[in-house]
């Protein structure tokens, strides 16, 4: 049974294994990519181009390539989105994965293409089943 206590919910999130934490690092695809691939969400990977949809004015609508993905904190670093430390060295501004949309996918990995195809088929089956149940009513 799952607890309703927020403290226990947070504890579960903090102690998730990396392979389960990976599922939390998903972002919506842009409308064009949704139509092209037939899926709505996908896990963010290094090399994807993303657009920031929430945040401060200087971050909002910023578009860039993902440089690093931190599974422990659930945040991503985007190329060109930096701030300067007191000594002048630039550091990345980490953005939470849920605050971005993916505008361009990095499809250099064949496994990722398989994942997209598998998700597309599952979505088509779901929509077909949903359509049949609404017709039956």
From Swiss-Prot:
InterPro entries xref list: Rib_uL2_dom2 (IPR014722), Ribosomal_uL24_euk/arc (IPR005756), Ribosomal_uL24_KOW (IPR041988), Translation_prot_SH3-like_sf (IPR008991)
Please provide one cellular component term from the Gene Ontology annotations of this protein.
large ribosomal subunit
Keywords per UniProt: Ribonucleoprotein, Ribosomal protein, RNA-binding, rRNA-binding
Write down the Pfam families for this protein, in alphabetical order: Ribosomal_L26
Mind listing the GO biological process terms from this record?
A: translation
Q: Could you confirm whether the keyword rRNA-binding appears in this record? A: yes
What molecular function does GO assign, one term?
structural constituent of ribosome
Q: Does the keyword Ribonucleoprotein apply?
A: yes
Q: How does it assemble?
A: Part of the 50S ribosomal subunit.
Q: Which family is it part of?
A: Belongs to the universal ribosomal protein uL24 family.
Q: What does this protein do?
A: One of two assembly initiator proteins, it binds directly to the 5'-end of the 23S rRNA, where it nucleates assembly of the 50S subunit.
Its protein name is Large ribosomal subunit protein uL24
**From what organism does this protein derive?**
Sulfurisphaera tokodaii (strain DSM 16993 / JCM 10545 / NBRC 100140 / 7) (Sulfolobus tokodaii)
């Amino acid at each position: 049974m799952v607890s309703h206590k927020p403290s226990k919910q947070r504890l579960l999130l903090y102690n998730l294994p990396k392979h389960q934490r990976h599922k939390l690092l998903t972002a919506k695809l842009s409308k064009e990519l949704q139509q092209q691939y037939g899926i709505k969400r996908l896990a963010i990977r290094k090399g994807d181009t993303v657009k920031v949809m929430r945040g401060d004015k200087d971050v909002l609508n910023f578009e860039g390539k993902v440089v690093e993905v931190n599974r422990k904190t659930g945040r991503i670093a985007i190329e060109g989105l930096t701030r300067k430390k007191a000594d002048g060295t630039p550091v990345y501004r980490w953005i939470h994965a849920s605050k971005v949309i993916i505008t361009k996918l990095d499809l250099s990995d064949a496994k990722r293409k398989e994942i997209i195809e598998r998700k597309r088929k599952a979505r088509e089956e779901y929509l077909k089943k949903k359509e049949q149940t609404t017709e039956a009513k």
